Amino acid sequence: KPAPVEGKTVIGIIFQTDESRISAKEKALGYTHGLVMAIRSAHGTESPLTRYSFDTSFDTIPNKKTGVAWYGDIEGYQWTLNILEAYPGEKIQKCPAFDFTTTDFKPSAPSGTSGWYVPSIGQVWDMLSVFCGGEVAAHLKTLRTYGSDITYYYKYGGDLKLSYDPIAALNSV
């Protein structure tokens, strides 16, 4: 890890610099240097977990279930914009993950950036591949071309046996 720089505060960790894994929307807006995961999670004061949406008819973001679709979805920035448009003003409270991420999230993202947004499943995939160690990355690589329902794969027999704790690996970053 690089040494801290005096007078600077770390607000996030770069997890992706491959331009092919940055969305067309972000590229068009000039956000091409890389993707950053905030070092704080966006959640309420009562829980370290955040619900995606309380709206039972939520359909603003397409539901993707194959490994191909998961890996290919790098549209977190666009999905966040779609949610903000579909749930304007106080209605955003129906989607806590998006509300906490886009409403007064601290630390603020620097000016000239896309700002914070909820990552898509493909962007979470990239984070896990980078931060959870080589075995997780190797396993995820095998699923990039998995064309069946990946949730079924894990629910009914697909397993991942690791020689280490991936959450500990993620938390060590």
Regions found by a protein language model. Give the residues of each.
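An exposed tryptophan-centered "aromatic clamp" motif
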Residues: E90, K94, F98-G115, I121-V173
